[in-house]
């Protein structure tokens, strides 16, 4: 809050009354006089013109705007269909059984070194939270008790999260490394296979997943 020092207030009062010196205004006739009105206006103008002499605090705000990542999705990875072979239902008679793994990859392009290192993929499908397979969404004649599961191609067979809650950052070991500061093409390798949720019945199987490139 702006504060007016007492000495400066007194000085303003002294200067504002100088023009009324020698006048005969006093007592009750002073409060309604022209001199009184001039006195009051001069004092107010003097106080308003005074600079602020006290600062009680300060708040500094800081932030940052970052650019979008440089990576783009390779054309043949952007919208693709992975076809799994036909299998007999006997191969998927128990919950948790898998069959017919098919490899596929998603490749990024035009990444700078920093983005290639931070890039990961976030998969989302029509699944419930924590579900580690894509539900069968075939429109007609679909097989029951079976879905599609995406797993890592690193030999562990670990399923990829497909509910949009956790991204996968594991890239193929021969990609995504700095190459003399040139553009880099990191590749994400996977397998897709049938996944039984019970004794599978005969029919069509179809599932769709979307993915986003994230940087962290």
UniProtKB/Swiss-Prot annotation:
Keywords, comma-separated and alphabetical: Cell membrane, Fimbrium, Lipoprotein, Membrane, Palmitate, Signal
Signal peptide: 1-19
SUPFAM superfamilies, sorted: Bacterial adhesins
Main location: membrane
Subcellular compartments: Cell membrane; Fimbrium
Key word Cell membrane present: yes
Repressor as UniProt keyword: no
InterPro entries: Adhesion_dom_fimbrial (IPR000259), Adhesion_dom_fimbrial_sf (IPR036937), Adhesion_dom_sf (IPR008966), Bact_Fimbrial_Adh_Pro (IPR050263)
GO biological process, one term: cell adhesion involved in single-species biofilm formation
Topology within the bilayer: Lipid-anchor
One cellular component term from this protein's GO annotations in UniProt: pilus
Region of interest (Disordered), ranges: 159-180
Residues linked to a lipid group, N-palmitoyl cysteine type: 20
Lipidated residue numbers (S-diacylglycerol cysteine): 20
Family membership: Belongs to the fimbrial protein family.
Function summary: May be a minor structural protein required for pilus biogenesis.
Name of the protein this chain belongs to: Minor fimbrial subunit HifD
Species this protein is from: Haemophilus influenzae
């Amino acid at each position: 809050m702006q504060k007016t020092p007492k000495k400066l207030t007194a000085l303003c009062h002294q200067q504002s009354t100088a023009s009324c010196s020698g006048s005969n205004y006093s007592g009750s006739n002073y409060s309604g006089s022209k001199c009184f009105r001039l006195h009051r206006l001069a004092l107010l103008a003097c106080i308003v013109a005074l600079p602020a002499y006290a600062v009680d605090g300060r708040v500094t705000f800081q932030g940052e705007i970052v650019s979008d990542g440089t990576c783009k999705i390779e054309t043949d990875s952007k919208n693709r269909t992975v076809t799994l072979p036909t299998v007999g239902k006997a191969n998927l008679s128990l919950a948790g059984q898998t069959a017919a793994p098919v490899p596929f990859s998603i490749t990024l392009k035009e990444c700078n070194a920093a983005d290639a290192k931070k890039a990961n993929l976030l998969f989302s499908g029509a699944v419930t939270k924590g579900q580690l397979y894509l539900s069968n969404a075939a429109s007609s004649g679909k097989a029951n008790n079976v879905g599609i599961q995406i797993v890592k191609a690193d030999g562990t067979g670990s399923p990829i999260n497909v509910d949009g809650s956790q991204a996968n950052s594991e890239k193929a070991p021969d990609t995504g490394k700095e190459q003399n500061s040139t553009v880099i093409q990191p590749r994400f390798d996977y397998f897709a296979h049938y996944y039984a949720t019970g004794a599978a019945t005969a029919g069509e199987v179809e599932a769709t997943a979307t993915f986003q490139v994230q940087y962290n």
